[in-house]
Amino acid sequence: MTGSSLTRTLLLFKTLWGWSDSLDLASERAQREGFDGLEVNLDHPCLESMPAVEVRRRLDRCEQRLIVEIVTGGDYTPSLQWSPDDHLAQLDQDLKRATALQPEKINLITGSDSWSDPIQDDFLAALLDRIEAVPVGVMLETHRSRSLFDPWRLPSRLQRFPRLRLTADLSHWCAVTERLMTPDLAPVQAMAGRVDHIHARVGHPQGPSVSHPFAPEWAEALDAHRRCWQLFLDQSVPSDQPFTITPEFGPDGYMPQQPFSGEPLADVQAINAEMASWLRSSLTMPAADS
């Protein structure tokens, strides 16, 4: 036998972004919809005042795994008053809290797009030192308003920081660059072997979310994202750790709304379930070497 006999499994996670019910109801619905686990913000109301052991018990009852999301800076768009040291101080506390939940992985939305390149580099170096001590995989998300907001700077950062692992959310970069991300682009090529988790939302050149990924008017955008996601799977390092994807259509101005009424154009819960099913049939994990 030559090469590695390991092959990564693919797991799909249900996002609790915008979820207003209990953890129990989320776990039960995720199980019905065929998800393998939940992705939840560390400060989500459904976890409030619940001991870590109780969170695990409730997830295990529905055979659901867990990805924890940590957001620094006060909100998803970070306060400009927060310094790098402020972000790092929060991470010191939140990484301990997240680890206690025994997650599959931890996703970080951190840093600020307002910092200069030297400050960004110092922040990332300090952050990666902290991640070294965490017993589960920790990824930084390619999120607008954050340290990895700019795709064109990413290749040099990946060279500078070989320990940096990524959550790929290409929809943010569509909005930042006013173009679709495609597999031929330098940042997509550079990041392919560093991606451990995907946020599968479909963006377009004018925004981070289409109204419905399976509407025919968005076919080009869906296919561009799918080809990038498949590249990430193809370039993933053989491992006994699963590759994970979270369909992440959501609220907060991402899902377009009807004028005047403010009603969403589509049901994000239904879209995410449909997206998970589509991803299972449309993406292929590379076979193990033999």
Q: What feature does the model see in each segment?
A:
Residues F13-G18, N41-P45, V71-D75, G111-D113, ...:
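Active-site beta-loop-alpha junctions enriched in small/polar residues
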